Regions:
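Oxidoreductase cofactor-interface core, primarily capturing Rossmann-like NAD(P)-dependent enzymes
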Residues: 1-46, 60-63, 67-72, 81-84, ...
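Residues lining the SAM
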Residues: 8, 78, 283
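Low-complexity, intrinsically disordered/propeptide-like segments
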Residues: 30, 50, 303-304
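Short, conserved active-site loop motifs that form the nucleotide-linked donor/cofactor pocket
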Residues: 51-53, 138
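Residue-level signal for pocket-adjacent positions within structured domains
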Residues: 54, 159, 191, 273-276
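Cofactor-binding loops of NAD(P)H-dependent oxidoreductases
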Residues: 57
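A hydrophobic C-terminal alpha-helical subdomain
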Residues: 234-305
Length: 305
């Protein structure tokens, strides 16, 4: 009997919902999935209906993680943007090594270095080192900002005000973006590839696009006037806190927004250039930002509660 793949954050969260996409893509291929979820709800039941084994667990409880990993062949590790990454990494690395896991695909942010611009990115660097020391066949996906992040931000003001309000500088600011589904395709490619070099890192950028182009795309696809309003970091943090973002996520995203608006992003710079990873490993061309907006029109125009 084929051992299942353990997929963490399988229900999906605020970001690109990559765990949910990975689970669905694996199940479509007939690969058994053990979906690691924080709680049982309608999202986990949807995965159960698709054929996934549901495991309700806690990233920070080593016994819970050991039970989740036992009997699995490989792991997709995507820790939410919240406190606890290093504890979760240590628990997963230990459990995976004990269980004889031979492959772990680790999702991190675009830059993963000791001097990366956000606290979460610097933690991601440490997390990578721990997984590699564990000798469990770890590889790392370094994904850029998700379309879904931008979509969530737009929904807060676009329906009522016809505006996208963010601290991203002028409309000439260029952003490296990617669809969560494309990141999931890369993850599935790495989880199922017969040839894999442990310790390898795969940058994933689907497109580079200016704020001006983003606003123009919203207006064209949604059929309404859309404008960009630059707000201060403090105003963004206040809005984010009111929407329930945790302090870790606010600190990470605030630093990320500063870094992006302060960088004169050159698409030829390898740190920000569109990568061929999605097509070569994920098996499909990157989703365009316009396609993302078309697919999410109803959500983008729905007023937030």
């Amino acid at each position: 009997m084929t051992r299942p793949v353990l997929v963490t954050s399988a229900s999906g969260g605020r970001q690109g919902k990559t765990g949910r996409h990975v689970s669905e893509l694996l199940l479509k291929r007939g690969i058994p999935v053990r979906a690691f979820v924080h709680k049982i709800d309608e999202r986990s039941e949807r995965l159960r209906a698709l054929g996934a084994e549901i495991f309700e667990g806690d990233f920070l409880d080593i016994r819970s993680v050991q039970r989740a990993v036992q009997g699995t062949s490989s792991i997709y590790f995507a820790y939410p943007v919240q406190d606890g990454l290093m504890d979760a990494t240590a628990a997963m690395a230990l459990a995976a090594r004990e269980a004889g896991v031979s492959r772990l695909v680790n999702l991190v942010m675009l830059q993963s270095t000791p001097d990366a611009p956000t606290p979460r990115m610097r933690q991601n660097y440490l997390s990578e080192q721990v997984f590699e020391w564990a000798n469990i066949g770890a590889v790392h996906i370094r994904a850029t900002v998700f379309y879904e992040n931008l979509g969530a931000a737009a929904r807060q003001s676009l329906p009522a005000q016809g505006a996208v309000r963010l601290p991203w500088g002028s409309e000439s600011t260029v952003l490296p973006l990617v669809a969560g589904e494309d990141v999931a395709r890369v993850a599935v490619g790495l989880l199922t590839s017969p040839q894999l070099v442990a310790g390898a890192a795969y940058p994933v950028i689907g497109t580079t696009i200016s704020l001006r182009e983003i606003i123009t795309t919203f207006a064209r696809v949604l059929g309404k006037n859309v404008r960009y309003e630059e707000i201060s970091d403090d105003e963004w943090r206040s809005h984010a806190a009111a929407r329930g973002y945790n302090e870790h996520a606010i600190a990470h995203l605030s630093a990320l927004w500063r870094a992006l608006r302060g960088a004169a992003i050159d698409p030829n710079d390898p740190r920000y250039a569109v990568t061929d990873t999605i097509e070569k490993i994920g098996g499909a061309k990157p989703k365009t930002f316009e396609a993302f907006v078309r697919e999410g029109q109803s959500e983008l125009l729905a007023k937030s509660a």
